[in-house]
């Protein structure tokens, strides 16, 4: 048996399950799942500003024979045994403001801002209790966790839309053009600044970093490490604004993503015999800005900074001086100089541009052909590097949609 999970006899399930959906967020009734604390007094601590507890065998003399050590980290006889209990730590709230306006006929404007805050002990970063416990980013170990920023919260989001309708009649039949532009802006993710290795010796690489306020609070292995570290700190807004503090889990935010989507919708009213029909043709470009610049409308990643793990714990000064020493972690042999830099590729369906065309009538709504799907299927692959690639793909979408839509209309009229 690799793990044992025990429930406290008084444990209760949350009264409400949490979810986020634009302006509606329901928070758990202060009842998140966490592990019970294993109390042990007399723990040694590091010297200096970062004075977290030390579990390492090589740094801590063990007078308590009830605690065993294996290798270089603390090891209890009840391996991987966790106890589930309730906690009252944590809270959450959402505030939203939406403004709608119609300054002139047929012009619709909308602007909305949503702020969400959520603090919790655990966002359940694992598939079972033991992996969840091991996945917590902490200072003094996973048994000592305070409420911290929710792993999946989006603190700030702005959405807006502009819509304009141009109606006209032709031979007594209504025609109309709808032009719509949609905007969404948000930070694409929350990250934690942690050390690259296990500093406190508890056997888990989840130690949150201490952000020194100046050179007096941190010791480096080399002068080059020191210079590279402070250069990195000054370019990162979170590190620069939280000097002298421990990094909070998931509190560092990725740069904002600004995305625009465009829709053109045409209304066609026509008669077949004595029956009047309405036909709509919609043309959508998702993430239209990405057609202009490949770096627009997509999120950045933190691969260039080793996923925000920039400091490596190198040990202490001596057996009698438990002052930690660090080095600056190198990515591909070079010191990182940016936190976020590598753009996600167009393989990410949620980020790249796509075009879709949809036909619908008052009897049938059918056909949605996406340019993005054609890329996956390899259509027009011989023209992919051609400047006409986009227009070929668009022509294919429109013609296929119209033909399929008209055929569907014919079948509906004939009763097939």
Outline where the language-model segments fall.
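Gram-negative outer-membrane beta-barrel transporters
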Residues: 4-174, 178-187, 406
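Primarily recognizes Gram-negative and organellar outer-membrane beta-barrels
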Residues: 6-25, 86, 114, 118-137, ...
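Hydrophobic, lipid-facing positions within transmembrane beta-strands of outer-membrane proteins
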Residues: 93-97, 156-162, 258-264, 351-357
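Short loop/turn motifs that connect adjacent beta-strands in outer-membrane beta-barrel proteins
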Residues: 106, 167-176, 269-281, 363-376
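Extracytoplasmic gating/loop element in the C-terminal half of outer-membrane beta-barrel translocons
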Residues: 178-275, 280, 305-355
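Outer-membrane beta-barrel "beta-signal"
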Residues: 347-371, 375, 390, 394
